[in-house]
Amino acid sequence: MALTPQRGSSSGLSRPELWLLLWAAAWRLGATACPALCTCTGTTVDCHGTGLQAIPKNIPRNTERLELNGNNITRIHKNDFAGLKQLRVLQLMENQIGAVERGAFDDMKELERLRLNRNQLQVLPELLFQNNQALSRLDLSENFLQAVPRKAFRGATDLKNLQLDKNRISCIEEGAFRALRGLEVLTLNNNNITTIPVSSFNHMPKLRTFRLHSNHLFCDCHLAWLSQWLRQRPTIGLFTQCSGPASLRGLNVAEVQKGEFSCSGQGEAAGAPACTLSSGSCPAMCSCSSGIVDCRGKGLTAIPANLPETMTEIRLELNGIKSIPPGAFSPYRKLRRIDLSNNQIAEIAPDAFQGLRSLNSLVLYGNKITDLPRGVFGGLYTLQLLLLNANKINCIRPDAFQDLQNLSLLSLYDNKIQSLAKGTFTSLRAIQTLHLAQNPFICDCNLKWLADFLRTNPIETTGARCASPRRLANKRIGQIKSKKFRCSAKEQYFIPGTEDYHLNSECTSDVACPHKCRCEASVVECSSLKLSKIPERIPQSTTELRLNNNEISILEATGLFKKLSHLKKINLSNNKVSEIEDGTFEGAASVSELHLTANQLESIRSGMFRGLDGLRTLMLRNNRISCIHNDSFTGLRNVRLLSLYDNHITTISPGAFDTLQALSTLNLLANPFNCNCHLSWLGDWLRKRKIVTGNPRCQNPDFLRQIPLQDVAFPDFRCEEGQEEVGCLPRPQCPQECACLDTVVRCSNKHLQALPKGIPKNVTELYLDGNQFTLVPGQLSTFKYLQLVDLSNNKISSLSNSSFTNMSQLTTLILSYNALQCIPPLAFQGLRSLRLLSLHGNDVSTLQEGIFADVTSLSHLAIGANPLYCDCRLRWLSSWVKTGYKEPGIARCAGPPEMEGKLLLTTPAKKFECQGPPSLAVQAKCDPCLSSPCQNQGTCHNDPLEVYRCTCPSGYKGRHCEVSLDGCSSNPCGNGGTCHAQEGEDAGFTCSCPSGFEGPTCGVDTDDCVKHACVNGGVCVDGVGNYTCQCPLQYTGRACEQLVDFCSPDMNPCQHEAQCVGTPDGPRCECMLGYTGDNCSENQDDCKDHKCQNGAQCVDEVNSYACLCVEGYSGQLCEIPPAPRSSCEGTECQNGANCVDQGSRPVCQCLPGFGGPECEKLLSVNFVDRDTYLQFTDLQNWPRANITLQVSTAEDNGILLYNGDNDHIAVELYQGHVRVSYDPGSYPSSAIYSAETINDGQFHTVELVTFDQMVNLSIDGGSPMTMDNFGKHYTLNSEAPLYVGGMPVDVNSAAFRLWQILNGTSFHGCIRNLYINNELQDFTKTQMKPGVVPGCEPCRKLYCLHGICQPNATPGPVCHCEAGWGGLHCDQPVDGPCHGHKCVHGKCVPLDALAYSCQCQDGYSGALCNQVGAVAEPCGGLQCLHGHCQASATKGAHCVCSPGFSGELCEQESECRGDPVRDFHRVQRGYAICQTTRPLSWVECRGACPGQGCCQGLRLKRRKLTFECSDGTSFAEEVEKPTKCGCAQCA
């Protein structure tokens, strides 16, 4: 029903009111609109992974969270986020953002979290965050930032987490972090930082995480402050190391002493080198002078940031730059010349050259540019030279050059342009030269205007020609009549075998279907076509790409998928894919299925799949993958189905699937899993997750073969000795023999004879100098990105016409100092980018004319130190090097004689004359057969690899046919044998041997021992026609048949009445006492090593000696001196102390730890074991107590004192601080912490005073910390024992559960001088557990990992190890628990890694089998199924059943029931234990069910509970617990 306001009615709306109402409704509608491609839920807008190239419009004004990650956004403009005043979280990571305009975040005053990591930022504008006071977390990691300006973070005063790692930062301005006083996390690792301004981090008192490792810190005097700063904070900044000078390289900065930070000169020491960004600076790798910045050939992959603002020319040619980001040159308004030639540039931002009003020269040739964005040359009114040749440009927009009125030279030579729209060159009013050749022009009616233009303006100087149709092919466009340019349906304009780039005038039409492929709707079918690579151009509307059943071996990172924003499915199955370059799938965020089944992948890493943010199905079946590490699937958070069926997987690293947050189906079948200790985590993981298809089974070890992996018990996952360190790590992308840095591989001086395996496919520089190569490795042609190859100082003697094929990007080739004599005419064919060629130091005499025909870019030729023969045949080379001075004036002529010593560069060409043929040696270098190297009438053939090859006539062989095949020519028959030659080319000879010899050359004596008669172990020795027997010692005779009696009277060797004993090894003499030697002939001098003391005389006796003592001495060895009366008589020193006489006064020398006049008290103890304590039981009056003790430890945590249970006092070491928890009856209990840390290894005095509800804590006499517990007065339980250094397990668990202690670790260190109420305590009156030893000093520096330290051993403190451990520190496992076992009459049987039992022999019993007679075992025949056997005097042997079971043998399981439980719910997060803040009730389901049912929860209750953790953190989480149990179908 419509309401129509009537004139004069008070309820009607006036026109202004009506407009206001309509505007408000429209505003509300706009505020709730959702941008296209995005999802809006409440105040959250999710646009991630949608292929966006710019910030979307119409973002609701009330948005609080905005997800823009995983797109293709390149620039953030000032007004992109205008009006978003309520935004709190902004996610911009994983885009291609190259610039952020200042003021872009000004409206977002509530912004708390901003992530810009994994982008392409090079410059961080100052004051970018000046209005973001609420910003607490900022992530700028993994960008290309090169500097941190002074005002970069000005205004972000609440910033707590700042991540700047993995950038290219080399400059940090002084004061850059000064405003960040609340910062807790700062990461600067993996940058190029060499120095840091003094005190840069001193204003961060809350800093708890700090990373600075993996930089290039130069440790001179300017960095000395950092060493002291790091020493004061030993837990942060770990692994921060010096990179220079050489003497300090590799040392931790914190460990370098102050005196070692030195500067070499006075100027250096005066002040640190300034790092200022106000007007830019010269990049470290470049040279700058007179306004010219020269960065040629420096290996750059991006344009340097923060360049000098006053520069007029920048040279960036011969690098590896891949893109020109937005506004790359806009700040440098004085630029007049830019040279970016010979890079890898494939993309140019539309505003890359914006604002360069003075630019007159722009050089972009030799790149990979395919498209010129609209307006890329806009505003370049002064440009005169534009070189775009040697790219892949396929389309030019008609207005591409509209602002270039002053352009005089335009080169579009060597591109892929098929047509040009009419009017493309209309605005070029000053054009004088135009290069259009080497483009596949289609000369149809659309190109008629160009022919007319070129006839009117004859400025095209390269001879542009038509490529099609056939009737006009190869004809000059400017010379064809206009009427010939026509369009006809009968003619074919597309050139078969090439890509079709025939786009419309706006360059926006989708490309045609790839050659040979079929395109239906949005499906591109390219299967079974024997393709070796993915087609370069695919329609942008493609949703499914089928490339299965081809021969693709490498997936290259070409950026293809960045343009396919609608692609959903890629099928690459049944190819030969063995390598996927990192970044291949960049921009493929829309792809949900990727099939790589039946390929040859051996390993996988996360970089292979980077960009596949929306992937849900990943098929990797039937490959050769052997190992899955925890970086394999990073970033694939949306994958639901992962198939690894039928690979070679033997192990999987823990956490390998943690990043697959959405994973619901995993196929691991048909893999040869090695179920050792490295796979122990997987069984439990499979049981918990229940997402695995089938049951993957173990293949190794043998005893687990074919057992389902999830059924293997945890102890059975074990490693043999030596396998513990073998894990699953990503294969390094560098050969073992080489060193790699980015795309540079250095394999110099490694004695290599072949190319090493594992060279990265994207290598750009390869150094193989100083090795043993004899040929150019054929595999070099597979590395198509090579720009430099160094093969100098090898043994290469020849080149072939295919030595350097497929190296179109090669710019430098070094072949100096080899053995080259001749170079084939086509050796350098296809090297169009080659600029430097070194042939220096070879044996080349001549080069054929035209050898450098393809090397059109060559500017430097090194051919010195070669014997050049300068006749008329080399005249062309002299003229060639003179044009452009390509040779530096080093090469000299070696002949003919009249030209000897003359320079190739400066000698006039007319001097190069022929006066006859050159010498045979010169000619033979390229025609080696001229020198007739083959002997004995052999035929010579030129060979490209072996220089020449001889075909030998019958009867000869060898390289030069120098070896005769007459076998008898060398008199091969020995020992008088006669030689008989055999006929034929490969025939040999035979020998007629004399009697007694045999063999092919009569060299074998006939074996006469075949039928020997030697007996009794005699050894037959062959002679010429006879043999002899070598008899054992006790036999004689010709055949060793007679036994020798060595003990007969005439042969007995024993003397001095020694007894002779015959043995199989001969006679043995048993000597009388006092004699020695083999035959007892030597009289033994017993005084030789006598022990007589104090000048006593030794008297030799029979088999002994006696000592004659000096007067006053006594004892068997005269060791007892005359004894004076000692003052120690009657003095009783206790606890093993010795009494010494000091000034006629007895003094007890106490052992370590004891004190008192008679060493009667134990005052200091050392806790050397991890689980031990002391217990006092007779202490009183706790509510009012004064406790003092001294503590020394290097540990972070440990219990010092504990008394009580519910009402308690607890003193513990927590993270280095002393924590006191005190509960005299009030609730809740309270705790205080010391400000000081005491875990520095020194002794510290801890004083504690309790007075009813008040506690005072003081460290080393400092200011006390006070705590008041207000509440009812209550006296603590004085009967509870006082525990020192730890407590029993049950007390520990109870105290931990009630939060009375935060860390249950026992104390490890030293405690001494414990005073309670001013009374020094005696530790001997305590219950002392093993592992506590007297004294502090001896055991303080000896840590026994699995044992106890004994401080008073003879050699000093020693470790007594637990069973199964050994070594100085009890840290080395011994060979099993049975090593050194104590079984007397029995066999040692291992129970586990550390324990064993004794299996007694018949007739023995006891734990060690040391008791005679077997003891009857009452439980021997009783098998309790669910319980244990117990024997008693009344019942005898009977079963004690486990809960839930009954019956005589505990065989009956109780019916299903629910046992009520009320307790805290606990979980573990990392190293922290977390429990709910209040207890909750639930039931535990136990018992059996009839049939196949299971006892389980029938009714579940879900509650959201708050957890508090032992590390101080808290969180809320939903918990589901059963409230009713019953029988149901098993899950």
Swiss-Prot record:
What PROSITE patterns does the record point to?
CTCK_1, CTCK_2, EGF_1, EGF_2, EGF_3, EGF_CA, LAM_G_DOMAIN, LRR
Where do glycans attach? N72, N192, N406, N571, N630, N762, N801, N806, N1026, N1079, N1186, N1256, N1303
Q: Where is the CTCK domain?
A: 1456-1531
Please list which residues make up the signal peptide: 1-33
Cite the LRRNT domain residue spans from the record: 34-61, 273-309, 504-540, 725-761
What follows loss of this gene? Mice show significant axon guidance errors in a variety of pathways, including corticofugal, callosal and thalamocortical tracts. Mice double-deficient in SLIT1 and SLIT2 show retinal axon guidance defects and a disorganized lateral olfactory tract (LOT).
Q: Which SMART domains match?
A: CT, EGF, EGF_CA, FOLN, LamG, LRR_BAC, LRR_SD22, LRR_TYP
This entry carries the following GO cellular component terms, namely: extracellular space; plasma membrane
One term of GO molecular function: calcium ion binding
Q: Which UniProt keywords apply?
A: Developmental protein, Differentiation, Disulfide bond, EGF-like domain, Glycoprotein, Leucine-rich repeat, Neurogenesis, Repeat, Secreted, Signal
Q: Where are the LRR repeats?
A: 62-83, 86-107, 110-131, 134-155, 158-179, 182-203, 310-331, 334-355, 358-379, 382-403, 406-427, 541-562, 566-587, 590-611, 614-635, 638-659, 762-783, 785-806, 809-830, 833-854
| GO biological process, alphabetically ordered | axon extension involved in axon guidance; axon guidance; axonogenesis; dorsal/ventral axon guidance; motor neuron axon guidance; negative chemotaxis; negative regulation of axon extension involved in axon guidance; negative regulation of synapse assembly
Query: Which Pfam families does the UniProt entry name for this protein?
Result: EGF, hEGF, Laminin_G_2, LRR_8, LRRCT, LRRNT
How the protein assembles, per its UniProt entry?
Interacts with GREM1 and ROBO1.
Name the record gives this protein:
Slit homolog 1 protein
What organism, scientifically named, is this protein from? Mus musculus
Q: Which gene encodes it?
A: Slit1
